Amino acid sequence: MISSKPRLVVPYGLKTLLEGISRAVLKTNPSNINQFAAAYFQELTMYRGNTTMDIKDLVKQFHQIKVEKWSEGTTPQKKLECLKEPGKTSVESKVPTQMEKSTDTDEDNVTRTEYSDKTTQFPSVYAVPGTEQTEAVGGLSSKPATPKTTTPPSSPPPTAVSPEFAYVPADPAQLAAQMLGKVSSIHSDQSDVLMVDVATSMPVVIKEVPSSEAAEDVMVAAPLVCSGKVLEVQVVNQTSVHVDLGSQPKENEAEPSTASSVPLQDEQEPPAYDQAPEVTLQADIEVMSTVHISSVYNDVPVTEGVVYIEQLPEQIVIPFTDQVACLKENEQSKENEQSPRVSPKSVVEKTTSGMSKKSVESVKLAQLEENAKYSSVYMEAEATALLSDTSLKGQPEVPAQLLDAEGAIKIGSEKSLHLEVEITSIVSDNTGQEESGENSVPQEMEGKPVLSGEAAEAVHSGTSVKSSSGPFPPAPEGLTAPEIEPEGESTAE
């Protein structure tokens, strides 16, 4: 009788394969048999690709090579982790290995070291990108590779840059060059800058001296700024004297006068006041001076105009542009006048020195007073004085002196010239008849221009002159400016 039940045919090698997986499960004892079985067959398939042999021999050899290692517990955990996601097993198992190898290479260490050095040198430019890239590199690697970056090997000195460079702009080279340029401009050529400022701050009028007196003339240059800055004035002559002149600010100082200038007789017309020329030394025996003076009587300005002062060997003539004041010396006594007198006359002062002085002054205020024995002229102006003095010829060389704290000038010789900013000229009829106890005259400033011997008179804008060879009368009351006290006629007579 024929049975209707079909006959099942077992494929070749199925029994051997099932026996192999059963042995592997028994030896390794995995927690998840399904994942382990999948990993087993995957490894077996990969292993079979390398060899072409019978299934029985393949399973037997696979057990000897792979399953025996799994039974020791070295790789089953890794196999189980790989079995969690069978589709990504190969990718995940290879990427961490490659990153680990890349972080251990020498090239990676070198690049990270150089990058850290750059970050230290230029934090303002590379700090943010460096941080982002470091974080990116750390995120790509499965193992922490930051210790190598945080502790780089010994680096060159640029890593020891001071922290202040971390806050400089993006281009520190330009900033440094700019700062150095400013410093050099401040510290270089200070005298030139001062001279330029002075020259442009006030008009300057220069008169030429006749050729017959050129050998003996001395031009004094005293450029001053109305704001009261202390400037350096060089007095150069045959004795090469260096004088420093200081100015003090006054309440009633004003802008330089722009009144039209009236030339003296037999002299050239002064240049226009368009732009003040830069003061320079004309010769070894010439010095140019520009002084700002202001005259006040009882804190009230008296007159304003342009004054040209010409001092000849026997007289001083001061013609004014708007108003000309004349003050003649009288031997007879007159009562002291408290109020200033201004009259359209020329000012004449007899002098005893054989020197010839010519000065052109731009005057703002002038005050004239007559006393019993004194003649005074108060002036405050900006002037350029050309002085010719024969008594200065042949004097011993006087070294340059520095300006003291009070703005006075000290020259260590009796035959010296002291210059000041303010001027008050007092002429005495008979200074020789005065008592010897009145030699000293109170001055608002310590510096006094002193001319030796015959040089008793001088008209300096912003200066005071005192003769060293005769007594001096006391200053009259009610005067607000320093005084010029030239020696009287008694020395010549």
From Swiss-Prot:
RIIa domain segment(s): 12-49
Tissue expression as described in the entry: Expressed in elongating spermatids and spermatozoa (at protein level). Isoform 1 is expressed in testis. Isoform 3 and isoform 5 are also expressed in brain, pancreas and numerous brain tumors.
Biased composition regions of type Polar residues, renumbered to the chain: 90-100, 426-442, 461-470
Processing and modification events after translation: Isoform 1 is phosphorylated on tyrosine residues during in vitro capacitation. Isoform 3 and isoform 5 are phosphorylated by GSK3B in vitro. Dephosphorylation affects its ability to bind calcium.
Pfam families: RIIa (PF02197)
Residue ranges of the region described as Disordered: 85-164, 244-271, 330-354, 426-493
GO MF entry, a single one: enzyme binding
Keywords, alphabetical: Calcium, Cell projection, Cilium, Cytoplasm, Cytoskeleton, Flagellum, Metal-binding, Nucleus, Phosphoprotein
Protein name: Calcium-binding tyrosine phosphorylation-regulated protein
InterPro entries: CABYR, cAMP_dep_PK_reg_su_I/II_a/b, DD_CABYR_SP17
Bias (Basic and acidic residues): 101-117
Function: May function as a regulator of both motility- and head-associated functions such as capacitation and the acrosome reaction. Isoform 1 binds calcium in vitro. Isoform 2 and isoform 6 probably bind calcium. Isoform 3 and isoform 5 do not bind calcium in vitro. Isoform 4 probably does not bind calcium.
The organism of origin for this protein: Homo sapiens (Human)
Modified residues (Phosphothreonine): T151
Quaternary structure note: Interacts with FSCB. Isoform 3 self-associates. Isoform 3 and isoform 5 interact with GSK3B. Isoform 1 does not interact with GSK3B.
CC annotations in GO: cytoplasm; cytoskeleton; cytosol; extracellular region; motile cilium; nucleoplasm; nucleus; sperm end piece
A biological-process GO annotation: epithelial cilium movement involved in extracellular fluid movement
Biased composition (Acidic residues): 484-493
Positions carrying Phosphoserine: S155
